[in-house]
């Protein structure tokens, strides 16, 4: 049994469940993009890097990986404003694009990114997220989803609070007293 970090309430998704689902997603993506000359995968930093690394090791179609960094969260809350901190290294016009995110919360950041990338004329544009919060708002579309989770603050497997907890091998709920000032 995995020892629970003292700042956590509970493990929502354990390491074994994550690895099984990552393989399933990679198989689905590989099947859906079979015959494509090259899949251009965009990992959203920092949160998606662990998920992205595990996912791309299982994708069997030819692919390249690039990164973008966006800012929409402060230390504890969503600001509503999205900024591109790091952009792609090359044009994506005519490319088949897969955006890989760690979490879709409100969908605001992903929606912003989709609008930006659609303007760059890719051949296709798809999204993949490890987790999506169950909320009563219309979030951006996620074509390949790992897990739906409750609307709680989560950390682990790339997800963080103040850059901490990112390397935990599972996804867990963070105690509210940790992020409440």
Where are these regions (language model features)?
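PRPP-associated nucleotide enzymes
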Residues: 1-181
């Amino acid at each position: 049994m995995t020892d629970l970090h003292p700042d956590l309430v509970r493990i929502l998704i354990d390491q074994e469940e994550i690895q099984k689902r990552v393989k399933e997603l990679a198989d689905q993506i590989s099947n859906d993009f079979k015959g494509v000359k090259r899949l251009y995968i965009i990992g959203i930093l920092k949160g998606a890097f662990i998920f992205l690394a595990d996912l791309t090791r299982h994708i069997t179609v030819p692919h390249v990986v690039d990164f973008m960094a966006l800012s929409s969260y402060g230390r504890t809350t969503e600001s509503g404003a999205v900024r591109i901190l790091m952009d792609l290294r090359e044009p994506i016009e005519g490319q088949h694009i897969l955006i890989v995110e760690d979490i879709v919360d409100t969908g605001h950041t992903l929606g912003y990114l989709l609008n930006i990338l659609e303007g760059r004329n890719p051949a296709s544009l798809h999204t993949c997220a490890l987790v999506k919060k169950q909320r009563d708002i219309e979030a951006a579309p996620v074509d390949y989803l790992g897990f739906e989770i409750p609307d709680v603050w989560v950390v682990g497997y790339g997800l963080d609070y103040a850059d901490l907890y990112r390397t935990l091998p599972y996804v867990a709920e963070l105690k509210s007293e940790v992020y409440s000032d």
